[in-house]
Amino acid sequence: MSKVITSDSQLAELLSKTKRVAVVGISDKKDRPSNGVSRWLIKNSHFELYFVNPALTTVLDQPCYASLADIPVKIDMVDIFRKVSDIPAVVDEAIAIGAQSIWIQLGLVDEESAERAIAAGLDVAMDLCIKVEYERLAGSISPQE
């Protein structure tokens, strides 16, 4: 059953079962959280990262896609680095591509979008930093093939 992920064990399970992550709202500016978190995840996580920003064609030496639908592989998790008013459209797109989960970054809360994602069968982590949680729970994360 889909839910808002809150406990450490749920977070570790979600991070373990996730392989492909789309970072929506990636910036090419090194001082932006989306860039720093993505650089850390590339070096320190088991994730395959895919980047979404219609204003960019490449970022961090990888292709950058205009939308989630443009990514040529199935995405497990959509990690959102956009302002709250943009979250509903990103959640709709995540549902449309069949993502398994949504990660709404630290400082961002959109209960209505979270409820819509859960109703569509997605797990939701909200108001959490994926880098911080991955680093904190690293000993409990067991990547699955």
What are these regions (language model features)?
Residues 2-75, 88-106, 110-145:
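Structural/interface elements that position substrates and couple domains in central-metabolism enzymes
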Residues 81-82, 106:
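Glycine-rich, N-terminal phosphate-binding loop of Rossmann-like dinucleotide-binding domains
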